[in-house]
Amino acid sequence: MRGQQAPQQPTRVRTPRENENEVLGVIEQMLGASRVRVRCMDGKLRMGRIPGKLKRKIWVREDDVVIVTPWEVQSDEKCDVIWRYTKGQVDWLNRKGYLEFMR
């Protein structure tokens, strides 16, 4: 099957769960010490913390699309990064209209 592409299988993409207060965001700046600046889809700019279990599994870079959960205290200023999307998943989110806030 060299040179041929396998038929596309439906992709399963994790979307933000509103009942768990999850929000989509884009990483704007890496601040160091597991901290990032995230532009969220609700229009707020938050400082995000990358938990250790996520930091060890995947690398997060600027312009990555992520899911964040705002803190209960200081919810307009701080959040935790809980998921990072791959390029194919970002394309799917774009086609389905989840990333309208980025335009």
Swiss-Prot record:
Keywords: Initiation factor, Protein biosynthesis
Domain S1-like span(s) in chain numbering: 11-86
Any matching Pfam family: eIF-1a
Recorded GO MF terms: RNA binding; translation initiation factor activity
Annotated signal sequence range: none
PANTHER family noted in UniProt: EIF-1A (PTHR21668)
Sequence similarity: Belongs to the eIF-1A family.
Stated role: Seems to be required for maximal rate of protein biosynthesis. Enhances ribosome dissociation into subunits and stabilizes the binding of the initiator Met-tRNA(I) to 40 S ribosomal subunits.
Protein's name in the database: Translation initiation factor 1A
Source organism: Methanococcus maripaludis (strain C5 / ATCC BAA-1333)
